[in-house]
Regions:
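Conserved structural position within tetratricopeptide repeats
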Residues: 67-70, 100-104, 134-138, 168-172, ...
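N-terminal leader/linker segments that initiate helical-solenoid repeat arrays
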Residues: 16-81, 88-93, 97-100, 104, ...
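Register position in tetratricopeptide repeats
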Residues: 54-55, 88-89, 122-123, 156-157, ...
């Protein structure tokens, strides 16, 4: 019981934080700003949906999240949660649309962007994934995951110049390492650039 209570409490704290962040984001868009009463209702129904999700009453939680969007159609927190349901139900187009809108409305939320980038890769939409990941690498400078994801894509596409550029960006954040130098050595050999290849391991 204690473990469940902590799980619920942690989930509700995250949800409250998300709702507050959403309200803050909306304050920058006067047209979409909620009244205090609307925000109170949104928070109530969103937290209730979170509670029902924990209780595995998914149908009721889904309905409440949709109700949240009648209060605030631009609420990224509700859109993100709905996207998870759509994806679980194998309704990828609806899930992708909801995730895209969540990211559009709250571009500073790393996890929304990360979820969308992962979905693009799963759907083999590499161009969209690359655009988003490149944008994330600029917006979230403390995160290395977008750069590693780009590294994987560029490697698969054999875009070796971009692989080197991305490795250099990682090196700029982490500092030089034997692992990075050896990877650049390997890529330069693929590019038949022996001069730079051996320069890396000198």
């Amino acid at each position: 019981k204690t473990g469940l209570f902590l799980l619920v409490a942690g989930f509700l704290l995250v949800s409250c934080g998300t709702s507050r962040k959403q309200a803050k984001a909306l304050s920058a868009k006067p047209v979409a700003e909620l009244t205090p009463e609307q925000q109170r209702k949104y928070d109530y129904f969103f937290l209730e949906a979170s509670r029902l999700k924990i209780q595995k009453d998914y149908d009721a939680a889904f309905d409440l999240l949709q109700h949240c969007l009648t209060i605030n159609p631009n609420a990224s927190s509700a859109l993100y949660e709905l996207a998870q349901y759509y994806l679980f139900l194998k309704q990828a187009p609806q899930g992708q649309a909801a995730l895209e809108k969540a990211v559009e409305n709250d571009p500073d939320n790393y996890w929304y962007s990360q979820g969308l980038a992962n979905l693009y890769q799963q759907q083999d939409e590499k161009e969209k994934a690359v655009r988003l990941l490149e944008d994330m690498s600029v917006r979230f400078t403390d995160k290395l995951d977008p750069l590693y994801a780009l590294l994987d894509i560029y490697n698969r596409q054999e875009q070796y110049d971009k692989v080197i550029a991305t490795l250099n960006r990682i090196e700029g954040k982490m500092g030089k390492s034997e692992q990075l130098s050896m990877e650049k050595f390997r890529i330069y050999l693929q590019m038949k650039d022996n001069k730079n290849a051996f320069h890396e391991i000198e």
